[in-house]
């Protein structure tokens, strides 16, 4: 009798475990956005959606934006940069005008949850095509990238989260080149608490303008966003010889 009871008890435990595993498989953990939105009150959620619209004034493709396109960039990197702006680690140098404007803009963000919402929203968007404006020697850029960049940013510029190296394959060429120049000039990566920024600032010292253009042109050409036709290409017929 006791043996039968033990058998039934064991059978019941196994059945319960199978049931729990089945429920877990059918009910996976919610995606980050679901977790964020469930945490937010309706009023706060509506406000965060308004913040997205505010961000798109400078970071959208429909406006005369001069900020980088953020669509498809990694959540962890976007969140980290927003927090750096909010804490004053970035955006406090008036000589770096675009970054200084961002330092002013993030004052609209009230808390970490709103930062998380914004980072998550942009990370979920499909990367947008970009006009390729940076010209360089692709072969030299390839050699430079493999020797000095791939170890932290990945063989295909896909990023390396463990080394805090963001993906470079979603960056527009003009923005990529601008940021490298700012690292080199000490306009970015100067704050004592900006550990990853300081690494980049040190790594960019002594790099020539030609080498910067070469590596940016290579990364964008080999791994970057889909090529977007320029305004001239869109307005002038393909066979036209007339100047624009």
Task: Describe the predicted segments one by one.
Residues 64-71, 86-115, 125, 131-136, ...:
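Axial heme c-ligation environment in periplasmic c-type cytochrome domains
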Residues 27-29:
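Bacterial signal peptide processing site
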Residues 50-60, 80-83, 104, 116-120, ...:
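C-type cytochrome heme c attachment motif
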Residues 32-61, 134-158, 232-239, 244:
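Sequence/structural segment immediately N-terminal to covalent heme-attachment motifs in c-type
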Residues 22-25:
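C-terminal motif of bacterial Sec signal peptides marking the signal peptidase cleavage site
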Residues 73-74, 80-81, 171-172:
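Extracellular/lumenal glycan-associated surfaces
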Residues 2-15:
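Bacterial N-terminal signal peptides that target proteins for export
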């Amino acid at each position: 009798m006791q043996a039968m009871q033990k058998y039934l008890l064991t059978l019941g435990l196994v059945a319960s475990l199978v049931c729990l595993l089945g429920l877990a498989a059918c009910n996976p953990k919610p995606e980050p956005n679901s977790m964020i939105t469930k945490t937010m009150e309706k009023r706060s959620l509506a406000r965060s959606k308004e913040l997205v619209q505010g961000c798109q004034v400078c970071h959208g493709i429909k406006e005369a934006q001069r900020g980088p396109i953020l669509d498809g960039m990694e959540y962890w990197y976007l969140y980290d940069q927003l927090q750096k702006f909010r804490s004053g680690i970035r955006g406090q140098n008036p000589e770096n005008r675009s970054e200084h404007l961002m330092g002013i803009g993030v004052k609209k963000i009230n808390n970490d949850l709103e930062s998380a919402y914004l980072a998550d929203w942009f990370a979920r968007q499909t990367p947008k095509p970009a006009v390729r404006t940076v010209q360089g020697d692709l072969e030299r850029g390839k050699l430079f990238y493999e020797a000095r960049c791939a170890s932290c940013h990945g063989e295909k510029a896909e990023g390396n989260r463990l080394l805090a190296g963001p993906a470079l394959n979603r960056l527009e060429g003009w923005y990529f080149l601008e940021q490298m120049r700012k690292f080199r000039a000490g306009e970015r990566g100067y704050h004592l608490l900006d550990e990853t920024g300081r690494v980049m600032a040190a790594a960019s010292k002594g790099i020539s303008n030609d080498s910067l253009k070469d590596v940016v042109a290579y990364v964008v050409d080999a791994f970057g966003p889909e090529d977007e036709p320029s305004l001239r290409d869109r307005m002038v017929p393909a066979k036209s010889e007339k100047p624009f």
